[in-house]
Swiss-Prot record:
CDD domains, sorted: DPS
GO terms for MF: ferric iron binding; oxidoreductase activity, acting on metal ions
GO CC field: cytoplasm
The protein, known as: DNA protection during starvation protein 2
């Protein structure tokens, strides 16, 4: 068991768990002309988040670690900030885009740590998530005309 790899993975579990809640918040509270589009998109993204949480937590268990599993732990180690009430639809999209861009940096570092630890399976798991996030970040930037 490599403690650095476990830390990287637990940070991802925490990030995805906070993001899961944030995406639900946005799914429920989005308003305006893009309601139907964003309501559906946020649901797609939180469903994907749930898959990542499970895959990463199971990887932690497979390599002998213990995944974080409480809201307290998530909030202590996550880089993701909870959603603020009163966000505009565009503000919601921008917040998620920024979260994804930050997570891309963390995933890249995590892949490097896993590779340096000869843990190709973890690196591959993180690469798959990275690829999905990179596409989502691009689409969110396009939505915002950035």
């Amino acid at each position: 068991m490599n403690k650095q790899v476990i830390e990287v993975l637990n940070k991802q579990v925490a990030d995805w768990s906070v993001l899961f809640t944030k995406l639900h918040n946005f799914h429920w509270y989005v308003k305006g002309p893009q309601f139907f589009t964003l309501h559906e998109k946020f649901e797609e993204l939180y469903t994907e988040s749930a898959t990542h949480i499970d895959e990463i937590a199971e990887r932690i268990l497979a390599i002998g670690g213990k995944p974080v599993a409480t809201m307290k732990e998530y909030l202590e180690i996550s880089s993701i900030q909870e959603a603020a009430y009163g966000e505009t639809a565009e503000g919601m999209v921008e917040a998620i885009m920024k979260d994804y861009e930050m997570m891309l940096v963390e995933l890249k570092k995590g892949m490097e740590i896993a590779q340096n630890s000869d843990d190709e399976m973890t690196s591959d798991l993180l690469l798959g998530i990275y690829t999905e996030l990179e596409k989502h970040a691009w689409m969110l930037r396009a939505f915002l005309n950035q």
